[in-house]
Amino acid sequence: MKKMLIGVVFPQTEFGIDPVAIRDYAQAAESLGYSHILIYDHVIGANPERARTLTGPYTFKDPFFEPFVLYSYMAAVTQDIELTTGIIILPQRQTVLVAKQAATLDVLSNGRLRLGVGLGWNWVEYEALGQDFSNRGQRVEEQVDLLRELWTKPLVKYKGRWHEVPDAGLNPLPIQRPIPIWFGGHADPVLRRVAKMGDGWMPNYRLAADARQALDKIGRYLDEAGRSWDEFGLEPRLMYGNGKPQRWATVMEDWQAAGATHMSINTMGSGFRTPGDHIQAIQTFAGYAGLSK
């Protein structure tokens, strides 16, 4: 069994906006031996008291940095830690622009980007960005197909249902051709999509036992697609505040037995009040997990 790669979730909703603290966090994660930094994505937050209520946890009061911009900064102050979106809400963004941003970041980071994508829940963001919330699941497959075309070919002729590229291309192309694309989400159409075209899956389930049915489905769908688990990644998250080392060990062992190739440690929601608290937490976990640079 391969060793599971351990990363951290950047705790941006609790971290503040001090660029020096952000630099210190990224450099600490790298020096402690974590394999990657994962960040969430929301472009805008809505007023929770608006007439049509939201269905998710975040509002305009929760700070989120733009992922590509934040990672460009982190790439400049680190050397080799992987930069992972978990996830970027792809259907609310312009596909060709995402291709350009991701390719540029991959070049500037020397091939360190892993792009996790998903559909999102915040319809307000879609409206504000001029995108259709209702057909986001239909559009995302074409988006992923086009991204890979743009990342691997100097010139692209593409005509789909929602996209057309008339013999044009990106320059520079990314270091990774193509950049790995992982999917979040857990609905059955998502699981089929993951198995059909994803490089990996980022489940929201906290425990491996809760994900068993979904993992079984992905296994069947991989078989149908002529693919194998050997070429597929699995990255759950571990909540730092939900237990101590004995509990951490159980959760990690169960996920690894279920096939997890990666795991991200999330220190948000643990009662920490300062950036230093979050940095101390990832230091503590690195010591427990035996990580080393």
Locations of regions flagged by a protein language model:
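Active-site-adjacent structural elements that line small-molecule/cofactor binding pockets in enzymes
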Residues: 1-293
